[in-house]
């Protein structure tokens, strides 16, 4: 009798362990992928897929956000003292504050490296990717040049028309051995219908919010990817989006998801004066 009872307990424990493992596996498969890849145990980021090489003078507002001299995310220059990036790019457990490299087409050399003095994530940012925005105050002011320039911002709640073409840029994963991410790359993608994007992400991630918008092609092929996070989506000369997350990279039916800058314009102005 005791042997049968022991055997039954062993079977029950085995079934519970299997169920737990399957649940953890499903959780891993359905988590949204931030556009930012791990170079350190405490870091995570993404890169441009299906794009082309550009010079920093073509996107002089682009910066590389770095921890321990390693590129981890992108960002955009708002003024001589302020940078806009994604809140999920900020790591509170890092041993030191990050730095930014400006004015260089390469994330590992050239330009100027400046330490971040203060990090201000949006107060509404949480675990569900909403309000994925953070401001970085620099220790020293930038000197503007052909390669270092601020980008204009939209007004609060300024609408984005469906099909608006924007340019995204960064040093993220290219998914191609032939395309190096050592130099700055970019691609052009159109914004997509908000309801259609929400439907695409509903079953896996619970959809998107009004503080987000999506951009990409139905067939996939062009997108941002790991270590592009925090970088710019620029349309008509304005920074309308911050690279945030998505399901894998450049997959058909899953456009990239961006934090909507117009939804936090007043907060940016109040916090930075820009």
Swiss-Prot record:
GO CC terms: extracellular region
Entry function: Constitutive trypsin that is expressed 2 days after emergence, coinciding with host seeking behavior of the female.
Positions of the record's site feature: Required for specificity: 223
S-S pairs: 73-89, 197-214, 225-249
Catalytic reaction(s) noted: Preferential cleavage: Arg-|-Xaa, Lys-|-Xaa
Family indicated by similarity: Belongs to the peptidase S1 family.
Alphabetical UniProt keywords: Cleavage on pair of basic residues, Digestion, Disulfide bond, Hydrolase, Protease, Secreted, Serine protease, Signal, Zymogen
Source species taxonomy: Eukaryota, Metazoa, Ecdysozoa, Arthropoda, Hexapoda
Active site: 88, 132, 229
GO molecular function: serine-type endopeptidase activity
One Gene Ontology term from the biological process aspect of the record: proteolysis
InterPro entries: Peptidase_S1, Peptidase_S1_PA, Peptidase_S1_PA_chymotrypsin, Peptidase_S1A, Trypsin_dom, TRYPSIN_HIS
Residue ranges occupied by any Peptidase S1 domain in the UniProt entry: 48-273
Identification of the protein by name: Trypsin-5
Tissue expression as described in the entry: Expressed in the midgut. Expression levels drop a few hours after blood feeding and pick up again 28 hours later.
Record keyword Disulfide bond present: yes
Record EC number: 3.4.21.4
Pfam families xref list: Trypsin (PF00089)
Major site of localization recorded for this protein: secreted
Source organism: Anopheles gambiae
Pro-sequence residue ranges: 22-47
Location within or outside the cell: Secreted
Stretch forming the signal peptide: 1-21
């Amino acid at each position: 009798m005791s042997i049968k009872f022991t055997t039954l307990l062993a079977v029950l424990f085995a079934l519970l362990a299997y169920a737990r493992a399957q649940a953890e596996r499903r959780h891993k498969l359905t988590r949204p992928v931030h556009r930012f890849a791990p170079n350190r145990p405490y870091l995570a980021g993404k890169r441009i897929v299906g794009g082309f090489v550009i010079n920093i003078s073509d996107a002089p507002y682009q910066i590389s956000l770095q921890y321990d001299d390693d590129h981890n995310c992108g960002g955009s220059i708002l003024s001589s003292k302020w940078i806009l990036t994604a809140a999920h790019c900020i790591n509170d457990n890092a041993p030191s504050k990050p730095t930014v490299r400006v004015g260089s087409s390469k994330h590992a050399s050239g330009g100027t490296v400046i330490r971040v003095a203060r990090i201000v994530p949006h107060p509404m940012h949480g675990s569900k990717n909403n309000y994925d925005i953070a401001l970085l105050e620099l220790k020293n002011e930038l000197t503007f040049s052909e390669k270092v320039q601020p980008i204009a911002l939209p007004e609060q709640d300024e609408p984005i028309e469906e099909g608006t073409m924007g340019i995204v840029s960064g040093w993220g994963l290219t998914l191609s051995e032939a395309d190096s991410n050592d130099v700055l790359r970019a691609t052009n993608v159109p914004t997509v219908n908000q309801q259609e994007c929400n439907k695409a992400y509903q079953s896996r991630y619970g959809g998107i919010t009004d503080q987000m918008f999506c951009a990409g092609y139905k067939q996939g092929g062009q997108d941002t990817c790991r270590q592009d996070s925090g970088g710019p989506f620029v349309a008509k000369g304005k920074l309308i989006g911050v690279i945030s997350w998505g399901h894998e990279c450049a997959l058909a039916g899953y456009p990239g998801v961006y934090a909507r800058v117009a939804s936090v314009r007043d907060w940016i102005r109040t916090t930075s004066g820009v």
